[in-house]
Amino acid sequence: MLEQQFAAEIQHIIDNKTKPLGALGQLEQVALQLALIQSQGKEQAATHIELKQPQMLLFAGDHGVADEGVSIAPSAVTQQMVLNFLAGGAAINCFCALHSIDLTVVDCGILLPVDSDARNLILRRLGSRTANFAIESAMTIEQVEQALRNGQQIAAEKIAQGADLLMFGEMGIANTSSAAALLSALSGHEVDHCVGRGTGINEEQLSHKIKVVAQGVGRCEGLSVNAILAEVGGFEIVTMAGAFIAAAEHKTPVLVDGFIVSVAAYIATLLKPEVRDYLLFAHRSEEQGHQIVLSLLEAKPLLDLGLRLGEGTGAALAYPLLKAAAQFYNNMASFESAGVTV
């Protein structure tokens, strides 16, 4: 858990800026959390918030459950989009470029491997895709454990290289099915409340998707977290959960994207509850399961734009709000320094 000895001092710094108490709303909460995180292990409160090297990690993986027709897109699209990310042509590339966010793609196991020596591609393949969880376990326990280790290693390396804020994105056809199954199995919420439209399926396809997800969830009752990850998890989702754990271990904040990334964050908090203190939430997505996981994490997202793209786009769009919180904390005058009396 975050050490709280500097919380009152940081709150005083915020309250003493030249504004009415609380007038900057949620930005004040963001500044408090960032300053508190950056005060961990220090002898005094952080009087300056550093956000100089944001890092987006985009985890890609394919899913055997795609064979059940739960998405309108074929698994080949995962590789095509990874190539698009590496070429700089996707929405996430546009938003990362706009805000000088470094983007790295992690191949956690996609059906069609990418033949590329791109500097921003990391290979941590656990296979070509998960097994079809509608009929068998998606992953082995060994794959789950390796995925968690992979995520921890990748995040730790980026932090060692200077990253002071992490953001995670994802790509994987049928990964909303895995995320919905994980959410239902881990939280006990009904499957039909966790399943959404993903790539834009119709009512008939949605009904089918709910039945498919329920088949996997039905095997999960009474299982441990790791066993549930093996039953219905995804390579990229579990790897991401490991990255969340490493971020907390290295006292680095993470700006959480949409539904799938939030499910990975939830998994990480079940494995390591202290992870929650390092999470800020970018947005509320259109996937209906996202509201459930936000409630479980007691999260108040910064934006509500009707997004349902994934890729980390919501996090990249919310990043300037974190910069704004740091800017007022670092540079806004106090009543005393400005000579303002109230």
From Swiss-Prot:
It is an enzyme of class 2 (transferase). Keywords: Cobalamin biosynthesis, Glycosyltransferase, Transferase. GO terms for biological process: cobalamin biosynthetic process. The active site is at 311 (proton acceptor). The keyword Transferase applies. Transmembrane segments: none annotated. It catalyses: 5,6-dimethylbenzimidazole + nicotinate beta-D-ribonucleotide = alpha-ribazole 5'-phosphate + nicotinate + H(+). Pfam families: DBI_PRT. GO terms for molecular function: nicotinate-nucleotide-dimethylbenzimidazole phosphoribosyltransferase activity. The keyword Mitochondrion does not apply. Its EC number is 2.4.2.21. It comes from the Bacteria. Pathway: Nucleoside biosynthesis; alpha-ribazole biosynthesis; alpha-ribazole from 5,6-dimethylbenzimidazole: step 1/2. Belongs to the CobT family. HAMAP family: CobT (MF_00230). Catalyzes the synthesis of alpha-ribazole-5'-phosphate from nicotinate mononucleotide (NAMN) and 5,6-dimethylbenzimidazole (DMB). This is Nicotinate-nucleotide--dimethylbenzimidazole phosphoribosyltransferase.
